[in-house]
């Protein structure tokens, strides 16, 4: 979710006719996330759209605080080391698309951001804790993951790139990694780790 002070990029697009007007670079505004869950314009100005309804597109990703050079192909990626909670959170990408033709008389416009990437959760358990010590799991990696792509802000569609690498994950009884949504071939080894120095997959 969003925290106080997070910078959110929004495209506020006037709809001048019946045809859908898609976002353009000049529609971009940087917003501040406030304590009450609202968003305010980072430039401190008041922006009014009295004549035409508006549609809204936007995103939040840690470190992205300016308009992308090409909003139809925004480079996105995940780090290959996600061993801390902070690294996990910074790997996320929130996206919103509201094509409801909002009008000025609406006092509140609610935006529902969604997680554009996928979270893989892992849970380890054993029926023989006397012989298998889960605390001795080390070097956990999700292997052969596509780690970069391009996101279309207008549609929310993700085009995967070609960079493939392993993701080093935090080892715990329950933990997760963030990945770009992608198909996993059947019977492919998804992860491996060491248990007491012995490799498992």
Task: Describe the role of every protein-language-model region.
Residues 143-155:
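Short aromatic-acidic-glycine turn motif
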Residues 1-135, 163-186, 190-201:
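Short, low-hydrophobicity acidic/polar segments
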């Amino acid at each position: 979710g969003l925290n106080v002070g997070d910078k959110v990029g929004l495209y506020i697009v006037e709809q001048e006719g019946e045809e859908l007007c898609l976002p353009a670079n000049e529609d971009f505004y940087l917003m501040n996330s406030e304590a009450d869950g609202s968003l305010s314009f980072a430039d401190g100005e008041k922006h009014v759209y009295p004549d035409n309804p508006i549609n809204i597109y936007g995103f939040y990703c840690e470190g992205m605080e300016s308009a992308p050079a090409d909003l139809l192909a925004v480079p996105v990626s995940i780090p290959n080391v996600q061993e801390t909670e902070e690294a996990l959170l910074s790997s996320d990408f929130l996206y919103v698309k509201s094509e409801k033709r909002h009008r000025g008389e609406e006092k509140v416009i609610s935006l529902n951001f969604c997680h554009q990437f996928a979270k893989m959760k892992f849970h380890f358990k054993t029926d023989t804790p006397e012989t298998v010590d889960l605390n001795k799991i080390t070097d956990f990696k999700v292997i052969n993951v596509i780690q970069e792509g391009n996101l279309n802000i207008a549609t929310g569609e993700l085009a995967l790139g070609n960079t493939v690498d392993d993701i080093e994950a935090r080892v715990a009884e329950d933990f997760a990694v963030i990945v770009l949504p992608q198909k996993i071939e059947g019977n492919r080894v998804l992860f491996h780790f060491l248990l007491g120095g012995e490799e498992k997959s």
